[in-house]
Amino acid sequence: ASTEPLRAERADEILREYSPEDNERQLTKWVARVVNVFSLFISLFLVYTAAFGQLPAMQQRSLYLLCAMVILFLVYPAFSKHSKKGVAWYDYLFAAASFGCCLYAFVNYEDILLRFGISNSTDQFVFVILAVLILEGTRRLVSPALSLITLIFLVYAYFGNVMPGMFQTKAGGLTRMADHMFMIPEGIFGSPLGTAATYVSLFVLFSSLLQGCGMGDFIQDVALGLTGRSTGGPAKVAVISSAAFGTISGAAAANVVGTGTFTIPLMKKCGYPPEFAGAVEACASTGGQLIPPVMGAACFIMAEYIGVPYSEIMLAGLVPGFLYYMSVFVTVHLRSKKLGLNGMRSEEHTSEL
């Protein structure tokens, strides 16, 4: 087996296969410019509103959703096998429809609020189009299973008043669905989107800036210097670097690519069994979602729902995160002792640094 670090192309292939959010298509120059414009705009918008105050809830969330949906349909193909092709014609249509639906909510937010949850035919039309687009975006970026489950519940909400027995609801139909899922902040423009449009994206932006400044390489060098020559050193490097990388990235797949492309070949080079090297990196990278301050989007939604400051959620996550990585670290040490896996030799340690 090769012990050389993964090439960037191979790492991208692995991400596209196992992580839907990294299955990006190859963009032409002008499409890439459009995506960059929307990305820059929403980044500056989030920083501005964080510093000088947010827009009304529906405007803040609809503008954020507008940019996110346009970027999604231009960047992520409908199927992974199309990732090397250009943007399909229907994706331009989806991006334009997303732009129009979200712009409608942004411009008419006062009129929508003044109607107190009573939708008209235009609202219902926009709701249907936007709901379909969100389901398709979820299928591409998260999983088809989540879109299917959501679709089942939407169908149930529509036909609930004609369902038999205990499954029957008091009312159903498109009007009631639009009233609750589009006109008031309980559905599409609810608190999960509000959390993403305020806190989550700021932390993701901060994480991207740190990674772009070379923080990932610095973390690996520090971990290598601390534990590289101790018993089970290369595996401990994976644990420490993954824990530290988790503070700037809440995604397990990104953690694996950020640290595993270095630590897995290093462990194999030092005589570690390939399955042991892979298992250590998988466990260490998965735990990155437990480490503050990012901790994944679910943490921010949790803070929104239970009504406590995010700082308290973050502090509460310190102890479980520490215990998790301490247990992985001790397990690696004991397993390395049992297998007779020593640390790196001085010349290997110096060359890697």
Positions of predicted regions on the chain:
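Hydrophobic transmembrane alpha-helices that form the pore/transport pathway of multi-pass ion
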Residues: 220-288
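Alpha-helical transmembrane segments
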Residues: 62-67, 194-204, 311-327
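Conserved, well-structured core domains of diverse proteins
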Residues: 1-114, 124-128
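Hydrophobic transmembrane alpha-helices of multi-pass solute/ion transporters
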Residues: 57, 83-86, 112-205, 351
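C-terminal ends of transmembrane helices
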Residues: 73-83, 134-139, 212-218
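Long, contiguous bundles of hydrophobic transmembrane helices that form the permeation core
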Residues: 2-32, 315-351
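Residue-level recognition of pore/gate-forming positions within transmembrane alpha-helices
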Residues: 153-157, 243, 285, 304, ...
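Transmembrane-helix bundle segments that line or gate the permeation/cavity pathway
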Residues: 6, 104-108, 112, 256, ...
